[in-house]
């Protein structure tokens, strides 16, 4: 990282690989529009100082960051000194819900970082997640995107498990009455239904493990299918 250059008596260091680049620096680099802004991000030197650096010296300083190479994904990345969870299904359902909602407000690398924050945070409250996100911005870019890759792979498998749950086979009368309109309530409707079944608060359901909620959904689907088959048998014309 050392460039052999000193400014105001301090050695200038510039990341020369993704391992040396923090995630926060990466996000800020994407927004940089001038060489001075790029230098400010890479060196943490004040922007006003960077603006007064001679162009030829500026080029020498930011050159190492022009080719950071390829990202080498780690098999066992660590974030904030902790291993990435290898069984997201055992963690709170709220984390999965929060990840599913990320695409509404974020995209690309920022969405990856927030996804990692959701699963690395100690708690599931927004304050815990935001505090963790702020800390992760100072983590190695390589570690964060590697963690994001592992989490994404698990989330994909979880989504596949949900997709296997059979949809209810509604009767024509139910369809005419507009039963499918209830689907607009999404996760809120699902959690409300589980809470009513167990006589608990919706907040309690969000704190259950994802695996427990998934089992509830599977059970509910099978029970619903059974009740419909039974009703058809019982009401079969004689």
Language-model segment annotations:
Residues 1-238:
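An amphipathic, hydrophobic-aromatic interaction surface with interspersed Lys/Arg
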